[in-house]
Each structure stands twice: as C-alpha cells, then as structure tokens.
From Swiss-Prot:
Catalyzes the 2'-O-methylation at nucleotide C2498 in 23S rRNA. This is Ribosomal RNA large subunit methyltransferase M. Gene3D superfamilies: 3.30.2300.20, 3.30.70.2810, Vaccinia Virus protein VP39. S-adenosyl-L-methionine binds at residues 187, 220-223, 239, 259, 276. Keywords: Cytoplasm, Methyltransferase, rRNA processing, S-adenosyl-L-methionine, Transferase. The active site is at 305 (proton acceptor). Monomer. GO terms for biological process: methylation; rRNA processing.
Length: 361
C-alpha cells in the first residue's frame, strides 16, 4: 500500500499535512499530500509502492502533533455497489494476514458521522468475510495488526492496516471521556485526556498517585485542579479569580490569589505542574522553562494557544526553542511530547518530563 491515511480535527488538515510531509521526508519516504479543508483527514501518497508500511512501522504516532490515528491505506475505493460492498473491500485487503481487529470508521465530521449507524451494522458481516479470507483471526488479538475501513462518504472508503504497537487504542483515535457532573468546567476533560495520552496505563499508578503535590497555574475556576484532586493530590491553585467552592471544601486545595507568572512555590516537592492560561504561547513556554530550570517539578502538562496562521510552524519553533533553552541552562535529561488532543480546540497540549529515568524521591 502506498498511502498513509491520517485522522485529524476538521480545520487542521493543513497542519497535519505540513507535519507528515516533513516527518516522512526525515525518513526518506517521498510523496505528496492530498487534503481538503474540513475533511478531518489527510492522505500522504508515497512515490514508492509499500512505502506506507515504512511509515506505520517507523514513524511513532505519539510523535505526531496533529494526527489522531494513522494507517497504511489502499487507493480510495469508489462506487462500492450497494448490493455487495464487502467483496471489493476484502479483495483490497488480500495482502493483510491474520489481523487481530477490524474497525469500520469515518472522519470526525458531521457529514461523515451520518454513516456511523451504517458502519456499526456493516462491521458484523465484514468481520465474518475477513475471517473467511484469512485477513482477520477468528479471535481478537490486541498484539496483531488492526484492519481499518474508513468510509469518507457513501460507497467511498479507504482500507488498510495499522500496527497495534503504533496505533491509537481508540476508535477514530478519539478517547471517549465522560464529563463529571461536579467538574467546574469542560476544560477538565483536557487534562483527563492528557493524562491518558502522555502517561501509559501501566505507569499511571506510579506517576499519577494519591498524596502527590501539584501546582495549577491559572487555575480558576478549577477544571484542571478538579482532575488532580480526583486523583488524590494536594494542589496549590494559583489564580486571581475565584475557585469552585466544592473543590475548596475537599481540603486538598490551597488557593493563592496571585499572578501565575509571578508565583514561586513555597514547597519544592512538587511532582505535577499544570497550566492552562489564555496567553501568548511563547510566554507560557518561557514560564514552564523557568520552572524546569529551577527544578520545581517532575512532570508538567500545559497548553499552548495556537495562532490563526502558520500553526504547525509556530508550535514546532516554540518546542525547539524550549529544548534549546533547557539544554543551555543545564537541563539535559528530559522528554517532550505535544498533541492536539480531541478536547483541545485552538491549542495544543504539551508534556514535559524531567529526568524520566530517575526515580522521584
């Protein structure tokens, strides 16, 4: 297969396209991008047959900012007959052997999601035929490749596969999170999703645990503080605005009515620093850099608001500058990740982990 199909948020196709063009080039996989505004997906067509397999194997999905999910894909299947859509799809997947799962998906647009009921019904007979052809195992296996069938319209679909060790576990790359009734704001879901994105399940008990100390800069009214409190942490909430009363009643939150850019923690045993402030992204990055250089936290999650234009260029420039400044100031052991989360809008979420291979005291 010579295409790489990438899911993204509608309206961010240009950013996703610019990113995959650059990252594929770094792996010497030549090709060109096919993308339309508000389609919520991008297709990177490789010049060489089977080159998409190189990308789904060697390009970590977690290293891509704007892609939610990706898979090696066939050319677009068009005019699938209503009386037999299955046969052309099974034929297009003839080179896929013993996959462990099949997902029938759509891009994340209102128009495409009108097909979601059809996709659910279609999955059952398709699964049976794929098992008969040998493309799909009789029993689901999370360690085997995943077959993707993405309908972009009636009778039009891209089909292909991803590898389970380099693929989102979520349908369409979208985690299904529920808004808690007592959460102070919808922004709470951003941090909830970020923890799932940046901290593997098997490490969450160690890295996101009860009793930890955390700081929330720009905390009002407490959407992000809520997620920290829910996990049993003690939080210094920094904001000139008011905090949610129920959060304050937990006894786990101390409210500092201060400017987050001027706040200095009294205690230096902080594990988590979180920050979601409506501010210029470069200024927020500088704030996090200062905290990192001072060694005031172990892990940080923060949002960077995106400009209207050149969003990919701006984000990558800020992240590169951050890494340079940290290294120039003696902070050399760290890991940075960045993702345009499902619950993000015109922003991206960044995770900075200091001394990732050194245990927290």
């Amino acid at each position: 297969m010579k295409n790489l199909f990438l899911f993204c948020r509608a309206g961010f196709e240009k950013e996703c396209a610019a990113e995959i063009q650059q990252r594929a080039g770094e792996l010497n996989v030549g090709g060109f991008v096919k993308a339309n505004n508000n389609d919520a997906y991008v297709v990177y067509q490789c010049f060489e047959d089977d080159a998409a397999d190189t990308l789904v194997k060697q390009l970590p999905l977690d290293s891509l900012i704007f892609a939610r999910q990706m898979f090696a894909a066939s050319d677009l299947l068009v005019d699938l007959p209503e009386n037999d859509r299955i046969s052309p799809i099974v034929a297009a997947l003839s080179d896929v052997s013993k996959a462990g799962e099949v997902r029938v998906e759509t891009p994340d647009t209102n128009e495409a999601k009108e097909l979601s009921a059809f996709c659910r019904k279609f999955t059952v007979p398709l699964r049976q035929h794929l098992k008969k052809s040998g493309s799909l195992l009789a029993q689901e296996n999370p360690k085997r490749p995943i077959i993707h069938v993405c309908f972009i319209g009636p009778g039009r679909a891209y089909v292909g596969y991803s590898y389970s060790n380099n693929s989102s576990p979520h349908f369409m790359g979208i985690p299904r999170l529920k808004m808690a009734a007592d959460a102070p704001s919808r922004s709470s879901l951003k941090l909830d999703e970020a923890f799932g994105q940046f901290v593997p399940k098997e490490e969450q008990e160690e890295r996101i645990r009860s009793g930890m100390n955390a700081v929330d800069l720009g905390a009002c009214p407490g959407g992000w503080t809520y997620q920290l409190v829910r996990r049993g942490m003690f939080v210094s909430a920094v904001d000139n605005g008011p905090m949610d009363e129920k959060l304050m009643e937990t006894g786990q939150v101390k409210h500092y009515r201060e400017d987050g850019f001027r706040f200095e923690p009294q205690r230096k045993n902080i594990y988590w620093l979180v920050c979601d402030m409506v501010e210029k992204p470069a200024r927020v990055a500088e704030l996090i850099e200062a905290w990192a250089i001072n060694g005031w936290f172990k892990e940080a999650i923060f949002n960077l608001k995106l400009p209207m234009k050149s969003r990919y260029k701006e984000v990558t420039a800020i992240l590169e500058t951050m890494q340079t400044i940290l290294k120039e100031n003696g902070v050399t052991d760290f890991k940075v990740q960045c993702k345009h989360l499902y619950h993000d809008r015109d922003e991206v979420t960044v995770h900075l982990w200091l001394r990732p291979n050194t245990a927290w005291n």
